[in-house]
Amino acid sequence: MGKTGNIEHVEERVESELMPPSMYKVILNNDDYTPMDFVIEVLQIFFRKNEQEATDIMLTIHHQGKGICGIFPYGIAETKVIQVNQFARQNQHPLLCSLEKA
């Protein structure tokens, strides 16, 4: 009986210590030089958006100055930002990807 009480106490403590990870928005920012087709390609490659979703997000970026590509835990968001920015530079585009806390 004593052991059961200890196990329940440990389970409660572990559950109370587990917190969901902080989530971050990955954002693409508008610029006057990156072609719309390239933005759509980025959204399809790095965020697995279909053509319609990618087009909708691209138009949001174009009209509102930025658009959310997805919401991820920090490590994944940071990796996507780095990958997108490297891909844009490799293709000679100034497209800027950033993240902010959700």
Swiss-Prot record:
Transmembrane segments: none annotated. Disulfide bonds: none annotated. GO terms for biological process: protein catabolic process; proteolysis. Pfam families: ClpS. It comes from the Bacteria. Involved in the modulation of the specificity of the ClpAP-mediated ATP-dependent protein degradation. Belongs to the ClpS family. Binds to the N-terminal domain of the chaperone ClpA. This is ATP-dependent Clp protease adapter protein ClpS.
